Amino acid sequence: LVRPPYSYSALIAMAIQSAPRRRLTLSQIYQYVAGNFPFYKRTKAGWQNSIRHNLSLNDCFKKVPRDENDPGKGNYWMLDPNCEKMFDNGNFRRKRRRRGE
C-alpha cells in the first residue's frame, strides 16, 4: 500500500470536517483515518503518535471539553475558524517544497 499524499494535519482536518458537528474525539479521528485510508489500517507504527503530536502543536486544532451531559472519555477537537480556509475546496494535498526552501 502507498502512503496517501496528505500531511497529518490534512488528515485531521478531513476527519473533523466530515463530522456533522465539526468536532471529534481523538479516538474518532483515528477511526476516520484508518477507515478511509487503508495504508494506516495496516500500518500500526507511529501514525497515531503523529496525529496526537499534530493536534497538540498545531494552532489550527482547538481542544474543546465535553458537555456535562456527554459521557465518555477525552475532549473534542475542532478546527480553528481561522484555519478552515486552508482546507477549502478539499485542498488537503501536501504543499510541495520548492527548490531552495
UniProtKB/Swiss-Prot annotation:
Its main location: nucleus. One of its GO terms (biological process) is regulation of transcription by RNA polymerase II. Low levels in lung and liver. GO terms for molecular function: DNA-binding transcription factor activity; DNA-binding transcription factor activity, RNA polymerase II-specific; RNA polymerase II cis-regulatory region sequence-specific DNA binding. InterPro entries: Fork_head_dom, FOX_domain-containing, TF_fork_head_CS_1, TF_fork_head_CS_2, WH-like_DNA-bd_sf, WH_DNA-bd_sf. SMART domains: FH. Residues 2-93 bind DNA. Signal peptide: none annotated. Possible transcriptional activator. This is Forkhead box protein I2. It comes from Rattus norvegicus. The lineage of its organism: Eukaryota, Metazoa, Chordata, Craniata, Vertebrata.
